[in-house]
A protein has these predicted regions:
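Positively charged
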Residues: 5-145
Length: 145
């Protein structure tokens, strides 16, 4: 049954409390490695309707996001968008909300972050993956879309 599956994979329930989601997250430390695993497991369990998640969506106020890009899912710890170009308007939906809302996103972004092994990384992203990252970084900042 569903419950046994959830216990084994550490798939967490999706948080929908707007007051909790409106709180800013704080930077993660190596003590939060289990949160990264749980978040990746939860994303993988929801891949049919979810392309990214932030830790506060599973009730943890830490700056950790996970992103699905094609067949891969990767984590970004303490992500900071350092550069963004090419603003555009888009309607976005979110697992934590019903319906979609308009927002401004950027075609190309650069991000400083730590990978799941807490090694420093710098990535350039464009298009769909960039949009997902921006949405999840907003979550870390207490912005729900």
């Amino acid at each position: 049954g569903q419950l046994e599956l959830e216990d084994k994979n550490m798939v967490k329930k999706i948080m929908r409390d707007p007051l909790f989601l409106a709180q800013k997250s704080v930077d993660a430390t190596e003590a939060d490695k289990q949160v990264i695993t749980d978040l990746l497991d939860t994303l993988r369990a929801n891949l049919d309707h979810c392309v990214g998640m932030a830790a506060n969506m599973i009730g943890v106020k830490k700056n950790i996001i996970v992103v699905a890009s094609g067949p891969f899912q990767f984590a970004m710890v303490n992500p900071v968008i350092t550069k963004k170009t090419g603003a555009y308007q888009v309607e976005e939906g979110c697992l934590s909300l019903d319906g979609t809302r308009p927002c401004t996103r950027y075609q190309e972004i650069e991000v400083d972050y730590l990978d799941q092994h807490f090694k420093k990384q710098h990535g350039k992203y464009s298009g769909w993956v960039a949009q997902i990252i921006q949405h999840e970084v907003d979550h870390c900042n207490g912005v729900v879309i």
